[in-house]
């Protein structure tokens, strides 16, 4: 990263707040803001966090679920653990069938909430990055539909564009409440937005839009 990016990050309010309040990343505030608004995670929930490194969202989720709940975090990178017995970290590719099976074992079957702040490797070319983002969203949905309990919730990062609109159109059929939003802590220049799905109807499989 360049010196200009580093300087801008240090001036960023949420970056400084994360350091002060001991959050692992500024992204923690996105989940805090969205959960405060939509009440996605509650005490006792089983939460699956996909693309979780460095653990900013898992950190917030652990606080919300309390000792009665469970957070399972998955990423290709190592996720440093938390001093909590109800946290499980899995290092691996969540599209891998063996990793999916391990996720289900750690969850004990089902999840109440599936969250993902994952982003694809970016090329700088908007159309390509949009397609990569939608592919990642669909990979998240592949496992979310497999593990999400009826009445469960999802929160997934995505980049705006026409292919995402097609995905959202299908999601509206499978959740009683579905919308897209952008929290205050998202950078203004970012094309990111978040899919908020509440009250899952219980469909067993996601049918991919992009093949």
Swiss-Prot record:
Signal peptide: none annotated. One of its GO terms (cellular component) is cytoplasm. The keyword Chaperone does not apply. GO terms for molecular function: rRNA (uridine-2'-O-)-methyltransferase activity. NCBIfam families: rrmJ (TIGR00438). S-adenosyl-L-methionine binds at residues 55, 57, 75, 93, 117. PANTHER family: PRE-RRNA 2'-O-RIBOSE RNA METHYLTRANSFERASE FTSJ3, RIBOSOMAL RNA METHYLTRANSFERASE. It catalyses: uridine(2552) in 23S rRNA + S-adenosyl-L-methionine = 2'-O-methyluridine(2552) in 23S rRNA + S-adenosyl-L-homocysteine + H(+). Pfam families: FtsJ. Keywords: Cytoplasm, Methyltransferase, rRNA processing, S-adenosyl-L-methionine, Transferase. Its main location: cytoplasm. The active site is at residue 157. InterPro entries: RNA_methyltr_RlmE (IPR050082), RNA_MeTrfase_FtsJ_dom (IPR002877), rRNA-MeTfrase_E (IPR015507), rRNA_MeTrfase_gammaproteobac (IPR004512), SAM-dependent_MTases_sf (IPR029063). Specifically methylates the uridine in position 2552 of 23S rRNA at the 2'-O position of the ribose in the fully assembled 50S ribosomal subunit. It is found in: Cytoplasm. Belongs to the class I-like SAM-binding methyltransferase superfamily. RNA methyltransferase RlmE family. Its EC number is 2.1.1.166. This is Ribosomal RNA large subunit methyltransferase E. It comes from Methanothermobacter thermautotrophicus (strain ATCC 29096 / DSM 1053 / JCM 10044 / NBRC 100330 / Delta H).
